[in-house]
């Protein structure tokens, strides 16, 4: 049938961890612990969505971070430096990720609504498997259990922005066509992943990395501040090529209804 058969969901900032704070805070701590180099939360967010080693590599190439590194060490960050920061990052992230495993508001009801429509729930993450093996059961205790998940280091081909994790979900879930899949993410590399896989893509402008607020901060934010931050996040996600941008996963069923109507008219992603 010419309709959406599966959604492939990101984790932090999409289904759990409103604001995607678990990885950002740990990057700051890992740089400090490994080399006594300070980076800001805003800098830590810039490459979000990539695999974590690649994320550290991208952070080292940010002009401001590179300038700090050059001032301290007289050279740019090396692969060995990235390995050292990653080695500091991993135990910190494994220890802390369960503290950020609660589903974002609306996720559980949305998953139930999608499953009621016969839609399968795939997922993938920029987290490596060692982190996912802690996060997945912790999220399950809170009621979020996707049908399949893939970690960024599971596949030889690699992770985002390549299509491979999304396509591995297609295979595992037995979906007949990539045009019958929707990739949902709160960061640009995840949107690129979906586009490269030939899927419809939906960006989340409020619940995730680009908006960058805790749930409590969001709840007390003025309408004006919300509007400014939403527009900033949405512009980045649209620039990455997202077909749709909404606030959070709670808005996804309406988007899928719209995509189903387009599929019925013969449209493709």
From Swiss-Prot:
EC assignment: the record states: 3.11.1.1
Q: What class of enzyme is it?
A: hydrolase
Cofactor(s) for this protein?
Answer: Mg(2+)
Which Gene Ontology cellular component annotation is one that this UniProt entry carries?
cytosol
Cofactor binding: number and manner: Binds 1 Mg(2+) ion per subunit.
Catalytic activity line of the entry:
phosphonoacetaldehyde + H2O = acetaldehyde + phosphate + H(+)
Q: Keyword annotations for this protein?
A: Hydrolase, Magnesium, Metal-binding, Schiff base
Q: Which InterPro entries match?
A: HAD-like_hydrolase_sf, HAD-like_sf, HAD-SF_hydro_IA, HAD_sf, PGP-like_dom2, Phosphonoacetald_hydro
Superkingdom assignment: Bacteria
- In this protein, the active site sits at 10, 52
One MF term from GO for this chain? Answer: phosphoglycolate phosphatase activity
A Gene Ontology biological process noted in the UniProt record is: organic phosphonate catabolic process
Looking at the keywords, is RNA-binding present? Answer: no
Recorded coiled-coil stretches: none
Sites where the protein binds Mg(2+): 10, 12, 186
Pfam families, sorted: Hydrolase
Asked if the Swiss-Prot or TrEMBL record annotates the protein with the keyword Hydrolase, the reply is yes
Q: What is this protein for, i.e. what is its function?
A: Involved in phosphonate degradation.
Oligomer and partners: Homodimer.
Member of which family?
Answer: Belongs to the HAD-like hydrolase superfamily. PhnX family.
- Identify this protein by name: Phosphonoacetaldehyde hydrolase
This protein's species is: Salmonella agona (strain SL483)
What is the gene name? phnX
